[in-house]
Curated annotation (Swiss-Prot):
InterPro entries: TonB, TonB-dependent_transducer, TonB/TolA_C, TonB_C. It comes from Helicobacter pylori (strain J99 / ATCC 700824) (Campylobacter pylori J99). The keyword Transmembrane applies. This is Protein TonB. Residues 71-97, 113-151, 159-172 have a biased composition (Basic and acidic residues).
């Protein structure tokens, strides 16, 4: 059996055949055109002009020209480059160098004044110091008396006896000191010295502060008895005890001054006054 080809195959065959035929026709026309341009044209006879032109050549030339013109981009007119004017160089300002500050002259150090030699103090001649009687402040005694007055003590017979004994002892010491008084006062009668001693012992009081503290000692007092009976220049000449007893000795002489006998002439005396707590 014969099989007939399908319409698809037939259409493919016909298209390929038509393509080959059209390609062959185009190739023949193109070859003819090339041969036609290369063949020399016969010279025209005299008096006659013969111009032969083929439409294909005109069309092709015109097309090629138009295509060439269209293909060429229009050249825009180029702007001429402006000549740059040379910039004028501004004259540089000359910077003047700043003047250097002149160094200030250093002040010359002032010469220090030489210290003047101080005059050496002349050695002072020491005068012999007079032994003045040191008076004890009366405040302590006043306080003690005020305390005694404010607090009344019960006085017993024993206390009275003790005080009498102490007073007698102080009187004995003062009487016993008459021999010493005679040694300090040559040329004065014993009777006169005894009267002075008894007057002093009657007014002499042993300070309680000294008794409490157990202070003892001897005070040598000097004084002057004038012809009118006045007593002056009372002072402590020598002492081996405290100011409490020194003050008590001076007060004893001041209080007993009105009991002293009047001398015929001015007399300078030195009387030792002893204070002792020892019981015989």
């Amino acid at each position: 059996m014969k099989i007939s080809p399908s319409p698809r195959k037939l259409s493919k065959v016909s298209t390929s055949v038509s393509f080959l035929i059209s390609f062959a026709l185009y190739a023949i026309g193109f070859g003819y055109f090339l041969l036609r341009e290369d063949a020399p044209e016969p010279l025209a006879q005299a008096g006659t002009t013969k111009v032969t032109m083929s439409l294909a050549s005109i069309n092709t030339n015109s097309n090629t020209k138009t295509n060439a013109e269209s293909a060429k981009p229009k050249e825009e007119p180029k702007e001429k480059p402006k000549k740059e004017e040379p910039k004028k160089e501004e004259p540089k300002k000359e910077t003047k160098p700043k003047p250097k500050p002149k160094p200030k002259p250093k002040p010359k150090p002032k010469p220090k004044p030489k210290p003047e030699p101080k005059p050496k103090p002349e050695p002072k001649v020491e005068e012999p110091k007079k032994e003045e009687p040191k008076e004890e402040p009366k405040k302590e005694e006043a306080k003690e008396e005020a305390k005694e007055k404010s607090v009344p003590k019960q006085v017993t017979t024993k206390d009275i006896v003790k005080e009498k004994d102490k007073q007698e002892e102080s009187n004995k010491t003062s009487e016993g000191a008459t021999s010493e008084a005679q040694a300090y006062n040559p040329g004065v009668s014993n009777e006169f010295l005894m009267k002075i001693q008894t007057a002093i012992s009657s007014k002499n009081r042993y300070p309680k502060m000294a008794q409490i503290r157990g202070i003892e000692g001897e005070v040598l007092v000097s004084f002057t008895i004038n012809a009118d009976g006045s007593v002056t220049d009372i002072k402590v000449v020598k002492s081996n005890t405290t100011d409490i007893l020194n003050h008590a000795a001076l007060e004893a002489i001041k209080s007993a001054a009105h009991l002293f006998p009047k001398p015929d002439e001015t007399v300078h005396l030195k009387i030792p006054i002893a204070y002792s707590l020892k019981e015989d």
